Amino acid sequence: PLLLSSAASDVYKRQDDGWSWRTSSLTKFTVVDVSNRSEPDVQRELFIEGAYITAREVNGTVRTVTHASMNIPDVKTWLDLPAGYWNLNYDDPLRLEIREKVAFQTMMENTESIDALELSDLIPQVYEYSDGEVSVHTMSDNDCAEFVAPESSLNRGISSIFTLGLTASALEYDVDHIVGNHPLVYASSDLLVLAETAFDAWWFWNNDGADEMTNLHTFDISAPDATLYTGSGRVDGTVLNQFALSEHEGVLRVATTTGQWMRWWMDDAEPMSSQLVTLVPSTDAETGHQVLVEAGRVDGLAPGERIWSVRYDADRAYIVTFEQIDPLWVIDVSNASNPTVLGELKVPGVSTYIHPLSRDHLLTIGLGPANADGTGLDWSATQLSLFDIEDPTDPTQSATLRLSPVESEQRDAWSWSWSEASYESKAFQYWAPKSMLAVPPVSYTHLRAHETS
């Protein structure tokens, strides 16, 4: 079978007094039988409530991750403050009194609305279209055994892992849910990880006490037709993308940056810094819950800089940070309890994607320097860089190539170029047998014409 995915729009549901809006996001899966290539046949069409994040097919089983908001029409996520509130001075005690009174009343009304809901009103649903009819499938048992919610969280969305068998004649699926923010997704051959911010942006704003943290939720996907929740943990900082996560021999490695949102309203906001943390599965002695506990860490990577790219290769991690110049960090993660920095290289520009060519070489794509002294970033061109890491304690940059085919020396011309491969790994195609790299460049040149008399 062939699986096609696409997006659909708003869903409404009928109530006694008419129609009401249910959700704005649907992910559609179409299962197509292509055994007869001249006459492909649509076997099944499924619509899952939630926005599509990613999917992977292994041996006839597809796992897809979606994220849906809890859309509750009668619940207010704002305060209906009276007009007089806005006329008061910011530090007027009456202003705070009005706000607290309205907030309390809103919470009471929201509680009544939530208490009146059925479970099916909250959780995502699956719709199957077949023979002109639409049937609804549940994504939960009544005991909510397939749900996990962080103990300290202000999140209002549901991330769902939908495990679908493609070869079965009848619809067969398994589903797991995390109550949380929109996640990043990482998967190895045996482990799937959802990484989501532990704070809600609305409440994090102007909140001096909220820490930048990331929740990590892990699932065993070693069995072809099942997804099993195996535990959760939390690390400080925020995760850049899926390449900042890696599982190797049962150890989860995570690279994060703290302080990058710069709480400008604070006099002593924490400085920006990056770290690498290793975690291993364990069981909480008090609750019996499956958890991820910290095994080791490397702190203080490039104070004042944030992470721009990460890549793991077995027992090594490569991290690029940047403020005015690009340090490449080589870290030994062979010992989970004692990850160690092996080497560091400061070079102009920055790498946004790292591709290990071999144990001794890295190929990266990113931006070159803007200034003659090697500082800043030249956003008008894409740069490829080759690094020699044969000696991990002394990495070197062996070559660079600036991709800007539209450069002009004409005085009144300016140009820029970029490549999708600088932020989308699927656009970075390296073919090892021929040592060939293919990246899609986009370029633009503006020439100003002058009239002469």
Regions found by a protein language model. Give the residues of each.
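Beta-sheet-rich non-transmembrane sensory/scaffold domains
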Residues: 1, 6-448, 453
